[in-house]
Amino acid sequence: MDTINTHQQHVIGLDFGSDSVRALIVNAETGQEVSSSVVYYSRWMKGLYCQPAQSQFRHHPQDYLDAMTSAIQEVLATVPQTLADSVVGIGVDTTGSTPAPIDENGTVLALLPEFEHNPNAMFVLWKDHTSVAKADRINELAHSGKFTDYTRYVGGVYSSEWFWAKAAWVSEQDEQVAKRAFSWVELCDWIPAILADTQHPQKLRRGICAAGHKAMWHESWGGLPEQAFLSAISPTLDGIRDRMFTEVFTSDQAAGYLSKAWAIKLGLPEGIAIAIGEFDCHMGAVGAGAGANDLVKVIGTSTCDILMVESQNVGDRTIHGICGQVEGSAMPELLALEAGQSAFGDMYAWFKNVLMWPLQAYAEHNPDFALTAEEIASELLPMLSQAAEQQGIDQYTPVAMDWLNGRRTPYANQRLKGAICDLNLGSSSPAIFSALVESTAHGAKAIVDCFIEQDVTVERVIAIGGIAQKSPYVMQMCADVIGRDIIVVESDQCCALGAAIFAAVAAGVYPTTKSAQAVMASPVRQTYSPTPKVQTLRAQRYATYRELGQHMEQIAEFHQSQEREDV
């Protein structure tokens, strides 16, 4: 650990991911990342409350509270008490849209004894796609001409991954939850409210990030969609607009201040600033040092892509096929355009699991082999990457479609499925893996093209996250396929770093996010540049990818038509 200056001000960034929460201590005056701790969600790691085959993924709220408490306590245990006393603020980022039903006191229903083990009373994780039918209903209503097109600023297509689809679907599936739910809350708004003891619906401050990108909040129509529209989505939403919110805030503002109870529990000073929460990818862009016309790809199990632009360069235009354009949802002074891929690292994990199945099955009946199987599992993806890189890609390499978890961007459609084509008896595991990696790079290129085709400037592409740090093969593939430099920054915890930057601003250490970012954001680690000699082949294979996508869309439409006939 570097020398620690305990006389300077420090902040904590909390990054709530799909599997774990990370707590990062940062020197607010130098940007030094002092120490961090990661704690996994115990119930989630046991697979509780989830049904992957039905795309149901739920998080118990107690998992978040337990893991957050442990992570902060653990990270503070690594530094002197004088440093803990110098912490002046906490920033929070989370996955999203990850909403949950709350009662009239702001308590998530699963924290009540009668709902403790009810998945419908928990947080509905971002990748839960059980509400596809409700997303279809929202799109139908928004484009019917009977209402304002509330999808205008979320790319023109509402996703089953988002707030209102999930709230409506869960409420229709569970009468008891629908009756008890006073309102709904996003995880990124709930955590700051818990820390500040402002979770009561009348006190709870909501961030513009979640409201604008996922709940169709926009000032041009007075905030949230009108009640008649919400009721048309589902009668279970009757009256909910008055129980939601009318005001939103950017993350350079305080959601509240650390309560006495939480200060004692965590070992931090009472009354320190708690910044307004934001989604992980937005704070990751800030932590990566991004500014106007920089596209930041937060690469993990999926990707979330943030492109920030000057508002006047977009004007009154709406950018189609993306996940929203919201003023101030990342850097407060810039318009943030959100996109993303529903599966990235999950594609590689799926293939790994397919290859490992016979070894794991054998290990179940031969315990002595279990350790060997674990060793193979830990080395499998690096071995595949090395072999795939050595073999390279040519016109005979299989072509894959990266929609194993649906398509987020361009034009959200969670009914779509993945595919691998052009297989033959000579297709090897490395060749198939290469096709899967290429497909995720193709998906990344489709997002860049979606912006450029609508006259939105993309100057730099910045990649953050574990895959960006650990897989040169994947990053070089992305550079070759997209045809642009891919910048990888030094920090391996940019989302938590972005949260820490906002904590510093909310605490008054800096007057603006831009001035805080100039000191605290991560420097560049390395740049991957396109390989000139492969560009012609890449263009040909991307054209094949696009054609395969059209076929997969037709298959999805066929399946949907069959479902309608069966009803």
Swiss-Prot record:
Catalytic reaction annotation: D-ribulose + ATP = D-ribulose 5-phosphate + ADP + H(+); L-ribulose + ATP = L-ribulose 5-phosphate + ADP + H(+)
EC assignment: 2.7.1.16
Alphabetized InterPro entries for the sequence: ATPase_NBD (IPR043129), Carb_kinase_FGGY (IPR000577), FGGY_C (IPR018485), FGGY_N (IPR018484), Ribulokinase (IPR005929)
Keywords annotated in UniProt: Arabinose catabolism, ATP-binding, Carbohydrate metabolism, Kinase, Nucleotide-binding, Transferase
GO MF terms held by the record: ATP binding; D-ribulokinase activity; ribulokinase activity
The protein's enzyme class: transferase
One Pfam family, short name: FGGY_C
Transmembrane segments: none
Gene Ontology cellular-component terms listed: cytoplasm
Pathway per the UniProt entry: Carbohydrate degradation; L-arabinose degradation via L-ribulose; D-xylulose 5-phosphate from L-arabinose (bacterial route): step 2/3
BP-aspect Gene Ontology terms: L-arabinose catabolic process to xylulose 5-phosphate
Protein family according to the UniProt entry: Belongs to the ribulokinase family.
HAMAP family, A to Z: Ribulokinase
PANTHER family, alphabetized: FGGY CARBOHYDRATE KINASE DOMAIN-CONTAINING PROTEIN, RIBULOKINASE
This protein's name: Ribulokinase
Naturally occurring in which organism (per UniProt): Vibrio parahaemolyticus serotype O3:K6 (strain RIMD 2210633)
